[in-house]
């Protein structure tokens, strides 16, 4: 066990976070995301909410400052977003510094980004449109 590292972060996830370079992207997905068919390494975090994992990793993870570092999936036309999902994610991401703007992209653009991601973390999150992408920045 390591000090000051949240027990929510598995050894596998900690290794992936350490291996990522600046500009690499990681997806924290809801339980329904088709992660295994996307291609990148898949890490299971069953039973955990995305917001809890975000809060756990953000002290260890520098967000990109040159490109939009936080991306979420936009609602499909005719569908509605639950604003509390983004609020929870913003709150989790702002524990170390102000949360950057969250960019919304359509579902298929998000899938394209997921296929190129360094890894996808499947959580137990059940919120609709509960997927979020983080782009790693340069550690100061």
Curated annotation (Swiss-Prot):
What GO cellular component entries does it have? Answer: cytoplasm
Q: Which GO terms describe its molecular function?
A: fucose binding; L-fucose mutarotase activity
Has the keyword Isomerase been applied to this entry? yes
Q: What are the record keywords, sorted?
A: Carbohydrate metabolism, Cytoplasm, Fucose metabolism, Isomerase
Organism annotation: Klebsiella pneumoniae subsp. pneumoniae (strain ATCC 700721 / MGH 78578)
Superkingdom per UniProt: Bacteria
**Active site, UniProt feature:** 22 (proton donor)
Name-wise, this protein is L-fucose mutarotase
Q: SUPFAM superfamilies per the record?
A: RbsD-like
Q: What EC numbers are recorded for this enzyme? A: 5.1.3.29
Q: Where does substrate bind?
A: 30, 107, 129-131
Concerning InterPro entries, the annotation shows:
L-fucose_mutarotase, RbsD-like_sf, RbsD/FucU_mutarotase, RbsD_FucU
Top enzyme class: isomerase
Q: For this UniProt entry, what is the primary localization, expressed as one broad class?
A: cytoplasm
Pfam families according to UniProt: RbsD_FucU
GO process annotations (BP): fucosylation; L-fucose metabolic process
What does the annotation say about its assembly with partners? Homodecamer.
Among PANTHER family, the record links this protein to: FUCOSE MUTAROTASE
Protein role: Involved in the anomeric conversion of L-fucose.
Q: Which reaction does it catalyse?
A: alpha-L-fucose = beta-L-fucose
């Amino acid at each position: 066990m390591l000090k000051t590292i949240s027990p929510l972060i598995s050894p596998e996830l900690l290794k992936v976070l350490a291996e990522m370079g600046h500009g690499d992207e990681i997806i924290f997905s809801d339980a329904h995301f088709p992660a295994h068919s996307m291609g990148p390494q898949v890490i299971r975090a069953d039973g955990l909410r995305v917001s809890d994992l975000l809060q756990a990793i953000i002290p260890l993870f520098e967000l990109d400052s040159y490109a939009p570092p936080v991306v979420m999936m936009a609602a499909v036309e005719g569908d509605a977003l639950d604003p509390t999902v983004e609020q929870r994610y913003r709150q989790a991401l702002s524990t170390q510094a102000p949360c950057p703007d969250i960019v919304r992209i359509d579902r298929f653009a998000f899938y394209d980004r997921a296929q190129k991601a360094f890894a996808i973390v499947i959580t137990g999150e059940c919120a609709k449109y509960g997927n979020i992408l983080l782009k790693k920045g340069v550690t100061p």
